[in-house]
Amino acid sequence: MKARDIIKMIEEDGWYIVRQKGSHKQYKHKTKKGLVTIAAHKMSDELALGTLNSIFKQAQIKK
């Protein structure tokens, strides 16, 4: 899955960007705890399976 698709998915779930440093973007949600960090040098980069699982876990999203 591409980075832009993941970002679109979590933004539709209510996550919004709170800070960015380089290629790392951090998102926060109004009701869910914690932060979601997405590191992608290009929006067209394919993210590794372990990275995707970590993002889904952080965002509390079922696959």
Which residue ranges define each predicted feature?
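Major-groove DNA-recognition helix of helix-turn-helix-type DNA-binding domains
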Residues: 13, 17-29
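C-terminal structural segments of small proteins and small subunits
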Residues: 8, 30-36, 40-63
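Absolute protein N-terminus
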Residues: 1-2, 63
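Amphipathic alpha-helical segments
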Residues: 2-14
